[in-house]
């Protein structure tokens, strides 16, 4: 029994050492091209700072990852946070400005109805407490994180359970 425990601990430690220290997302050694995302519907771009990306990741993990781990959507697996799905929404949500608007007052994928009572947002912060203290700067960082992830983890981001 002790041999199995030692083997398990050794395997976990080896996995952490091999994978944990080599991930570019973990080290956040991202070049300017990777940190450049679309700012608005006009095609303007913005280069996020490493600090904004770190902050966006931390805030996303705290407020969003319970339902959107890996860019998936647990409540509707057909609509992920990958760039293609975001671009096909109405209005398109494939830029920082539109994602910030969505986080303030979320709409259905077709843009027809508000879903603020069902989806965490600034508008529904009274029933989703994790949204209460988020500022516009926080929403900008979260949106930037969402748009940078496809460049960092490629098709894994929003790609489905086959990758996790």
UniProtKB/Swiss-Prot annotation:
MF terms in GO: electron transfer activity; heme binding; iron ion binding
First and last residue of the signal peptide: 1-27
Positions bound to heme c: 64, 67-68, 119
GO cellular component, one term: photosystem II
GO-annotated biological processes: photosynthesis, light reaction; respiratory electron transport chain
Any single Pfam family the record assigns to this protein: Cytochrom_C550
Subcellular location: Plastid, Chloroplast thylakoid membrane
UniProt cross-references to InterPro entries, sorted A to Z: Cyt_c-like_dom (IPR009056), Cyt_c-like_dom_sf (IPR036909), Cytochrom_C550 (IPR029490), PsbV_cyt_c550 (IPR017851), PsbV_cyt_c550-like (IPR016003)
Free-text cofactor note: Binds 1 heme c group covalently per subunit.
UniProt key word Transcription regulation: no
Necessary cofactors: heme c
Chief place where the protein resides: plastid
Domain of life of the organism encoding this protein: Eukaryota
Family to which the UniProt record says this protein belongs: Belongs to the cytochrome c family. PsbV subfamily.
Assembly, per entry: PSII is composed of 1 copy each of membrane proteins PsbA, PsbB, PsbC, PsbD, PsbE, PsbF, PsbH, PsbI, PsbJ, PsbK, PsbL, PsbM, PsbT, PsbY, PsbZ, Psb30/Ycf12, at least 3 peripheral proteins of the oxygen-evolving complex and a large number of cofactors. It forms dimeric complexes.
Protein name, UniProt field: Photosystem II extrinsic protein V
Organism: Emiliania huxleyi (Coccolithophore)
Gene: psbV
